[in-house]
């Protein structure tokens, strides 16, 4: 888009169609609630008699103890889908054809490259969908930017139900930003702001959208 010194390239990655399976984190065991044992059985005495003078046959039959209740199994509260890293060398986010296409796109001239990824590239402390679930693929992506001497790229990402801006040092001369915006109708139910070591400021949990303005001056 644009020409000359104002040429903007949009690269939109499909990070799900050919992606390997995510590895789910272990779920916590169900919570066992102990049951208070029933009181011991005691005979009911005749109220009009003196207990000291009662004979065995004068006593009312004992009240049978209630059957012990089975322990209640209360499942844990619903947890968001969380994942751990997939370190399989064959695991992938992009297919071989996608990687080849991406490298070809990065060789095209552009003053600004906006790379769109449905999942976050940089933020890696959370346990949801992200490039960090496939650390070898994430490294491959960053290495590809360095290999092609990309110094003018910005990543736009989503699927987090929050807004945040993350930054890493791509190399000694270049910082890479990942701007996350989502969602218009499904904000995060979390009560506390998400913290990530790469966030340049507080995350935002409310309904949000993002606008980008390019300053060519």
Kindly give the residue locations of the regions a language model identified.
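Long, structured stretches of catalytic cores involved in phosphate-ester chemistry, encompassing
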Residues: 1-217
